[in-house]
Amino acid sequence: EQSGDINRGVEREDPYNQGAGDQGMMFGYATNETENYMPLALDLSHSLLWELAEIRKNENDLMPYLRPDAKSQVTIEYDDNGKPLRIDTIVVSTQHDEFITAKGITQEEADLAMQKKIAEDVKSILIPRVKAQYPAHVQALFNDDIIYHVNPTGKFVIGGPHGDTGLTDRK
């Protein structure tokens, strides 16, 4: 069964704004963009997830709300010759602890504050750590025009197989 957190990003009253679910079709190929022959977008995405796991496991004080489930996607703009020009979009969805409601604010206000905190931490903690792992020509692709989608469906408390096992009841 799909968690309500994911379903909220899919089911919409306006049919023109229906979400596509929590799915994506990805493909890969060998390339000389990176030393490990992975496409640069995939390599960056993997680095984001490895670094999130590193923070969660070994430097938990930086982002103490992190939980194990996460996914990422990076979109890169290329010129006509296949040379990367810039990173266009970074998507990071990370499971987190339940939001704590402070006295005097609603659950919705607490949720929004936590979403803002996660987005800020992704930009100020995660991104610089990942960027530092790459050579100068890749670091130059990071700029202030990157579009960030951090937990774009909102709350992501229920993760792993309990959150979304899909049609096959597996994750």
Specify the residue positions occupied by each region the protein language model found.
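Glycine-rich, mobile lid/loop segments that gate access to catalytic sites or pores
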Residues: 1-161
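Compositionally biased, intrinsically disordered low-complexity regions
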Residues: 11, 165-168
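Conserved mixed alpha/beta catalytic, RNA-binding, or beta-rich assembly cores of soluble enzyme
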Residues: 127, 167-171
